[in-house]
Curated annotation (Swiss-Prot):
GO CC list: cytoplasm; small ribosomal subunit
Region (Disordered), start-end ranges: 74-98
Swiss-Prot/TrEMBL keywords: Ribonucleoprotein, Ribosomal protein, RNA-binding, rRNA-binding
Protein family according to the UniProt entry: Belongs to the universal ribosomal protein uS19 family.
Biological processes, Gene Ontology terms: ribosomal small subunit assembly; translation
Protein name, entry field: Small ribosomal subunit protein uS19
Cited HAMAP family: Ribosomal_uS19
Keyword Oxidoreductase: no
Length: 98
């Protein structure tokens, strides 16, 4: 369920403050954050935000088409390595039904 429009978007106060300071100075530094639930505002465009995925910080370059999305959408938390399969040389998988 989406957030109520009367509440407005959630943006971490400290993160927004750092981005606005960098905009006023014209700097482009990587900003580390643990706030995956923060919504990307137009002020973030052109900056790189390192979003924590539970293990490390994943650098995310914010573009125009990312405005309105949440930071956590661009830092996956799960690493999918594929399903376990039999060895292809010996044909270790189960026989197929006809």
């Amino acid at each position: 369920m989406p957030r109520s429009l009367k509440k407005g978007p959630f943006i971490d106060i400290k993160l927004e403050k750092r981005i606005l300071e960098m905009n006023s100075k014209g700097e482009k530094k990587v900003v580390k954050t643990w706030s995956r639930s923060s919504m990307i505002s137009p002020d973030f465009v052109g900056h790189t935000v390192a979003v924590h995925n539970g293990k490390s910080h994943v650098p995310v370059y914010v573009g125009d088409n990312m405005v309105g999305h949440k930071l956590g959408e661009f830092a996956p938390t799960r690493n999918y390595r594929g399903h376990a399969g039999g060895k292809s040389e010996k044909g270790g998988s189960a026989p197929r039904k006809k």
